[in-house]
């Protein structure tokens, strides 16, 4: 199953019996569109993230981002993230997508489960005031932040905000900074953040930054006692 964005206005899904294809479109239309209940006012219908829960044999889809108004308000709680349970066929949804009150959501959903806790992570937008703290956790613009919940369908509000997972690549001096896309994944009992930066491109072009991105991966540190997870590039 391959879930993808259709130019920011919907989520499609392809299926294949092999990762090398051939891939086919089983629906002939988008899985999520502006006509999907509770999705008509999502600014950007893109950046899908899917997680299969082996314990319950259930799948969940997270998506969305952006800000609806252009009046300078709504950056702190744009309410443009959505989560929904997938059908057993994984090409349908069960119920209405739920609104996520994700602090300063910009884009870039990732979802995983550690123990009995769900970890939703995302890229914050470019309008986070300096010194912003939620639940005692500091973060900045275009950081990868995360929230936790015991239920994949929430409620997801600022009460579930858990902190910064991965600081912006600019503040880490990896490159000149920019928005990011990532995934938090588990492999053989360890956790990793897969993300993009322009570090390799800068090295190859004599220090020049032309905004070419390459994929990188670093191991994350998971504290079992506190449930905190952090990563440095």
What are these model-derived regions, one by one?
Residues 1-233:
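Carbohydrate-active catalytic/glycan-binding domains of CAZyme proteins
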């Amino acid at each position: 199953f391959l879930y993808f964005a259709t130019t920011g206005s919907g989520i499609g899904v392809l299926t294949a019996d092999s990762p090398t294809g051939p891939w086919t479109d089983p629906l002939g239309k988008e899985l999520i569109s502006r006509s999907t209940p509770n999705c008509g006012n999502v600014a950007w219908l893109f950046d899908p993230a899917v997680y299969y829960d082996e314990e319950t044999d259930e799948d969940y889809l997270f998506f969305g981002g952006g800000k609806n108004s252009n009046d300078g308000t709504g950056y702190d709680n744009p309410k443009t993230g959505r989560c929904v349970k997938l059908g057993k066929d994984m090409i349908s949804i069960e119920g209405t997508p739920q609104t996520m009150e994700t602090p300063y959501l910009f884009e870039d959903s990732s979802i995983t489960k550690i123990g009995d806790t769900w970890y939703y992570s995302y890229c914050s937008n470019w309008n986070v005031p300096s010194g912003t703290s939620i639940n005692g956790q500091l973060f900045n613009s275009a950081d990868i932040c995360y929230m936790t919940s015991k239920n994949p369908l929430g409620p997801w509000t600022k009460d579930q905000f858990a902190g910064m997972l991965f600081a912006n690549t600019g503040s880490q001096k990896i490159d000149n900074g920019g928005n990011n896309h990532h995934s938090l994944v588990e492999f053989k009992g360890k956790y990793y953040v897969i993300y993009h930066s322009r570090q390799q491109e800068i090295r190859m072009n004599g220090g020049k930054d032309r905004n070419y991105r390459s994929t990188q991966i670093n191991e994350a540190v998971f504290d079992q006692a506190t449930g905190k997870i952090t990563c440095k590039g």
